[in-house]
UniProtKB/Swiss-Prot annotation:
One MF term in the entry's GO annotations: FAD binding
Record EC number: 1.3.1.98
Cofactor needs: FAD
Pathway: Cell wall biogenesis; peptidoglycan biosynthesis
Family: Belongs to the MurB family.
Gene Ontology biological process: cell division; cell wall organization; peptidoglycan biosynthetic process; regulation of cell shape
InterPro entries: FAD-bd_PCMH, FAD-bd_PCMH-like_sf, FAD-bd_PCMH_sub1, FAD-bd_PCMH_sub2, MurB, MurB_C, MurB_C_sf, Oxid_FAD_bind_N
Protein name: UDP-N-acetylenolpyruvoylglucosamine reductase
Active site feature: R164, S237, E332
Major place of residence: cytoplasm
PANTHER family hit by this protein: UDP-N-ACETYLENOLPYRUVOYLGLUCOSAMINE REDUCTASE (PTHR21071:SF4)
One Pfam family recorded for the sequence: MurB_C
Gene source species: Bdellovibrio bacteriovorus (strain ATCC 15356 / DSM 50701 / NCIMB 9529 / HD100)
Length: 336
């Protein structure tokens, strides 16, 4: 374990923002964390946890110590007549893990294919796509207490999941470091084809309706709409889909008959991309940043942007959507 000073994080965040960490270290074992906690100088610094950097807006300068979780490994740890229990270390790339489960014949995560980031970051955000969220199959989270180094296991309920949110993003933020995650994947195959164009993509290719082809359909759709962060800096979907009352949704629908919405519990989820597009921001730039020309929900860095540029655009887009539709849209990435 090596502590690095003035570490450049420009290539460690998918928005490709220029950012310099005062101190930086990669963790491979729980003992590495214990070593840090025994160092009075380091222990008293502010700490930040870095995963794949795909859901972060980083400032130009980061004071304190940035910890990157780099542990790797994935395996089947148990099965019963109804479920497979699969564990993945936090440092695993999320999509690599999803594709591995499918190769091994375990399904349930196929709709979450090609989402950027790491396994450890997935529960924090309760990542989701095409009608599926991490909370649907997550069994438990193994975390380390950043104050003591002691392990703690969180059940699904204790994670307090909600839409793009969890305990680890709220009360537990900065307190726990997620070390590994166990998923309970159903042996009874239930496909989710109703969201987006998944069914159309499967049928267009004359594929059988099975998990591996659903995953490929999701990959094809995402690649056609979302920019590769290695080519154009972005954090994927930048805004959450707002959840509104039936009354507000019906009122909007009476004025906009092509409004895109989905039932969500006893309310409705509106497509933020549709709102942003109709507010005139699809393909539009503000300085070095803009909303992607193929998907209005994606904020992109055209080069040389800072966190201030990102938030200036986000505020303007949000304001224009609210002015036109009376709906608040909230940024999804975490602000450091």
């Amino acid at each position: 374990m090596q502590i690095q000073n003035s570490h450049d994080l420009s290539s460690s965040n998918t928005l490709q923002l220029r950012s310099l960490a005062e101190r930086f270290v990669e963790l491979y074992t729980p003992a590495d964390l214990s070593t840090l906690l025994m160092n009075p100088e380091l222990k008293n610094l502010p700490w930040k946890i870095l995963g794949g950097g795909s859901n972060l807006v980083l400032p130009s300068q980061i004071e304190g110590l940035v910890l990157k979780v780099s542990n790797l490994g994935r395996k089947l740890i148990h099965e019963d007549p109804d479920y497979w229990f699969v564990k993945a270390q936090a440092g695993e790339v999320w999509n690599d893990f999803v594709q591995w489960t499918l190769e091994e014949g375990y399904w349930g995560l196929e709709n979450l294919s090609l989402i950027p980031g790491t396994v450890g970051a997935a529960p924090i955000q309760n990542i989701g796509a095409y009608g599926v969220e991490v909370k649907d199959t997550l069994w438990e989270v193994h975390a380390l207490d950043l104050q003591t180094g002691e392990p703690r296991v969180f059940s699904n309920k204790e994670c307090q999941f909600s839409y793009r949110d969890s305990y680890f993003k709220q009360e537990g933020a900065g307190r726990y470091l997620i070390w590994d995650v166990t998923f309970r994947l159903p042996k009874k195959n239930v496909l989710h084809l109703e969201y987006g164009d998944i069914r159309k993509e499967v049928e267009r290719n004359n594929w059988p309706q099975d998990p591996r082809h659903v995953a490929q359909a999701v990959i094809n759709i995402r690649q056609s709409k979302l920019p590769d962060p290695k080519v154009i800096g972005n954090a994927g979907s930048f805004f959450k889909n707002p959840i509104v009352s039936k009354e507000l949704r019906d009122g909007l629908l009476s004025k906009h008959n092509d409004l895109v919405s989905f039932p969500y519990e006893d309310r409705y989820k509106l497509a933020a991309g549709w709102l942003i597009d109709r507010a005139g921001w699809k393909g539009k730039k503000l300085g070095p940043v803009g909303m992607y020309e193929k998907q209005a929900l994606v904020l992109v860095n055209h080069g040389g942007a800072t966190a201030d540029d990102v938030w200036k655009l986000a505020r303007q887009v949000s304001s224009d959507v609210h002015t036109q539709f009376g709906v608040e849209i909230e940024a999804e990435p975490i602000r450091w």
